[in-house]
């Protein structure tokens, strides 16, 4: 039995889907454990591009069980649309299961998300306005509606009506918005219930049984460490815990069963939306990285901010997640630049530091300290062995390992899931 976890080490969009898809081949069960459809994975298989937002990337493997865990918040309309899109392309979703403890994103969550961002003005967080944050708020304040409620008609109706009493007051009196009527929501969501009920079950018990049976389980992280509500660049974060620790709370599996944790990173850094970014290159270099790496959001289509790889961040992530291996993408992309810089520390108040500050005010005082590397400018898309990489690429990767303190196990040299060097 092997229980593996794949997490992002930066601000998301690191290319986790490709490695998840590869590791899924060795797994019996693939689990999504946090976030909602504010995250996105892109997989390229046999030249076909699949963009997934809720369904685990392992769905392409029809002999595997795919689970949406209790830590995920589910917009049923989005989920059903995603299922339909897969079905239309010949991919079955019959092997998908949804935790009966997962919370539902409701129409008023999405409306509140929009109204709150508008209200914040210049202090807006930069949410995707998909209702994820307000849904997690309801979960924590114990007024959320779960999948088990969706398939219990009387309970669902009761909860919707009870919630709207307060939600409509907030929408109308605080934000000046239009109130919701209960009946249209009830009718819409009971329609979703009819379509989804066969997928909804107690997935915690299924995972416990799988462990007892010695099955291989893969936990698919969405987003990344620096979007974590506790360990990210707060408040420019998501509303959940997409770190390895979130596996346990987002699925019900105990921590002693986790064997391996892969941390996925790019050979540079990117992020979408507002928030600090110490190594950002708001210049021609950043523009070049964006174009070479096709850095546009899977979910939003927004251009991503781009900059140099920051090993202070990656080392911090390695500690938080107990990483056992790194998986690095875009080694082919970064090698095309005229020169490559690697952040090895920060200079703050005249001192060199190698830790990541919690305070954004303190982080703003940090100036990246760089080492410069020569590019390789070679086509490495078909390289299968680390030793066959250009010497300049090997030097860059070896230095990353040295600074982070974790070995690189997987190296992405192209978009396709087959374009991976397996170091160990």
UniProtKB/Swiss-Prot annotation:
Its EC number is 6.3.4.4. Mg(2+) binds at residues 13, 40. GO terms for cellular component: cytoplasm. The keyword GTP-binding applies. GO terms for molecular function: adenylosuccinate synthase activity; GTP binding; magnesium ion binding. Pathway: Purine metabolism; AMP biosynthesis via de novo pathway; AMP from IMP: step 1/2. The keyword ATP-binding does not apply. Substrate binds at residues 298-304. It holds the Pfam family Adenylsucc_synt. Its main location: cytoplasm. The active site is at 13 (proton acceptor), 41 (proton donor). It is found in: Cytoplasm. It catalyses: IMP + L-aspartate + GTP = N(6)-(1,2-dicarboxyethyl)-AMP + GDP + phosphate + 2 H(+). Its cofactor is Mg(2+). Binds 1 Mg(2+) ion per subunit. InterPro entries: Adenylosuccin_syn_GTP-bd, Adenylosuccin_syn_Lys_AS, Adenylosuccinate_synth_dom1, Adenylosuccinate_synth_dom2, Adenylosuccinate_synth_dom3, Adenylosuccinate_synthetase, P-loop_NTPase. Keywords: Cytoplasm, GTP-binding, Ligase, Magnesium, Metal-binding, Nucleotide-binding, Purine biosynthesis. One of its GO terms (biological process) is IMP metabolic process. Belongs to the adenylosuccinate synthetase family. PANTHER family: ADENYLOSUCCINATE SYNTHETASE. NCBIfam families: PRK01117.1 (NF002223), purA (TIGR00184). Plays an important role in the de novo pathway of purine nucleotide biosynthesis. Catalyzes the first committed step in the biosynthesis of AMP from IMP. Homodimer. This is Adenylosuccinate synthetase. It comes from Ruminiclostridium cellulolyticum (strain ATCC 35319 / DSM 5812 / JCM 6584 / H10). The gene is purA.
């Amino acid at each position: 039995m092997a229980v593996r976890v794949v997490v992002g080490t930066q601000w998301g969009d690191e290319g986790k889907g490709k490695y998840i898809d590869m590791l899924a081949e060795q797994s019996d069960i693939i689990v999504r454990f946090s976030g909602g459809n504010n995250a996105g994975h892109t997989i390229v298989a046999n030249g076909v591009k699949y963009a997934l937002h809720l369904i685990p990337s392992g769905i392409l493997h029809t002999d595997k069980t795919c689970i949406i865990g209790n830590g995920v918040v589910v917009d049923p309309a989005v989920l059903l649309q995603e299922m339909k899109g897969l079905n239309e392309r010949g991919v079955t979703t019959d092997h998908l299961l949804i935790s009966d403890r997962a919370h539902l994103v409701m129409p008023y969550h999405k409306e509140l998300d929009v109204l709150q961002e508008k209200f914040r003005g210049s202090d807006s967080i930069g949410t995707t306005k998909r209702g994820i944050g307000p849904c997690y708020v309801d979960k924590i304040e114990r007024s959320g509606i779960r999948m088990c409620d969706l398939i219990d008609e009387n309970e669902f109706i009761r909860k919707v009506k009870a919630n709207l009493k307060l939600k409509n007051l907030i929408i109308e009196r605080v934000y000046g918005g239009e109130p919701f009527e209960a009946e249209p929501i009830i009718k819409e969501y009971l329609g979703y219930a009819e379509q989804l009920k066969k997928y909804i079950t107690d997935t915690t018990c299924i995972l416990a049984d799988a462990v007892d049976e010695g099955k291989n389980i893969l936990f698919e992280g969405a987003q990344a460490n620096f979007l974590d509500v506790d360990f990210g660049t707060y408040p420019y974060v998501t509303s959940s815990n997409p770190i390895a620790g979130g596996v346990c709370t987002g699925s019900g599996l105990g921590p002693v069963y986790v064997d391996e944790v892969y941390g996925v990173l790019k050979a540079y850094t990117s992020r979408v939306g507002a928030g600090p970014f110490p190594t950002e290159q708001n210049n021609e270099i950043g523009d070049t990285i964006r174009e070479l790496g096709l850095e546009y959001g899977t979910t939003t289509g927004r251009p991503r901010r781009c900059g140099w790889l920051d090993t202070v961040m990656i080392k911090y992530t390695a500690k938080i997640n107990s990483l056992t291996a790194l998986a690095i993408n875009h080694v082919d992309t970064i090698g095309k630049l005229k020169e490559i810089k690697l952040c090895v520390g920060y200079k703050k108040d005249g001192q060199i530091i190698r830790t990541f500050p919690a305070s954004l005010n303190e982080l703003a005082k940090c100036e990246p300290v760089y080492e410069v590397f020569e590019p390789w400018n070679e086509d490495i898309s078909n390289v299968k062995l680390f030793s066959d990489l250009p010497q300049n690429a090997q030097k860059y990767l070896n230095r990353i390992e040295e600074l982070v303190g974790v070995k690189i196990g997987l190296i992405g040299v192209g978009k396709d899931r087959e374009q991976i060097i397996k170091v160990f």
